[in-house]
Design a protein with these regions (language model features):
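Residues lining hydrophobic/aromatic ligand-binding pockets adjacent to catalytic sites
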Residues: 1-233
């Protein structure tokens, strides 16, 4: 049994779903603090031939608010602008309809918060990619603790024998002496995004949102692309 623990980010890139595809349990840290100009609220799409940020319109009420409590500003104009831009830049892609499936998920409900909104998009995208990991909210588990101590407690909750982490977390896990604090095996994701035929760019642009992958490859192609990026030991 293994697990991975990540924040529910906005329109994640392919590597996010690669991580999810390798675990039994995927836990969304839905109660972390809101960070300005972070992956929580923005991601990259290919617009006018360049990687451009697309950001969610959220309310910044106080410095300590969690993404679980973060509400949205008026979204009607934002949604209309995004759809126009998407149509202009991806409308002629062979798999436009497949990518539009993701954009159609960006329908805001009055009760939505940043975490529940991102979670819904992540869950539905993972389903379309054929990913079978069980997805959970960390906030529902009522497990306290800081940094790696909380990660260990979450892994123990699911009787996980292995924790799979993105390589970007290696430094802080080392600083926290994660491996010395538990018998849970610590493994790092080995994923290298491959090139794919990318319409609209003169040179390949990596690490864009999964939307770009699906627009160029379709759902079946995106599924294969995500799995092929794993680097063998």
């Amino acid at each position: 049994m293994n697990c991975a623990i990540m924040q529910p980010t906005f329109l994640p890139w392919a590597g996010y779903f690669n991580l999810m595809s390798q675990v039994d349990h995927f836990i969304l840290l839905d109660d972390v603090q809101l960070e300005k100009q972070s992956w929580q609220t923005r991601n990259l799409l290919l617009l006018n031939g360049d990687a451009r940020w697309v950001s969610l319109p959220v309310k910044h009420d106080n410095l300590s608010q969690s993404i679980r409590d973060t509400e949205f500003l008026d979204t009607s104009r934002w949604s209309a602008k995004l759809m126009r831009s998407f149509q202009q830049n991806y409308g002629k892609h062979i798999h436009y309809a497949a990518a539009r499936d993701i954009l159609d998920l960006l329908e805001f409900q009055p009760e939505d918060t940043l975490s529940t909104f991102n979670e819904q998009v992540i869950r539905e995208t993972a389903k379309r990619l054929g990913i079978r990991a069980h997805i959970h909210r960390a906030g529902d588990l009522r497990i306290s603790g800081k940094r790696s101590a909380r990660l260990i407690s979450i892994c123990q909750y699911f009787d996980a024998e292995e924790y799979l982490s993105p390589v970007g977390s290696a430094d802080y896990l080392s600083e926290d002496s994660f491996a010395e604090k538990t018998t849970i095996s610590l493994k790092f994701q080995k994923y290298k995004p491959l090139l794919y035929p990318q319409k609209g760019s003169q040179e390949f642009v990596s690490h864009l949102s999964i939307v770009d992958v699906v627009a160029n490859l379709g759902w079946d192609g995106a599924r294969q692309y995500i799995l092929k990026g794993v680097i063998d030991e």
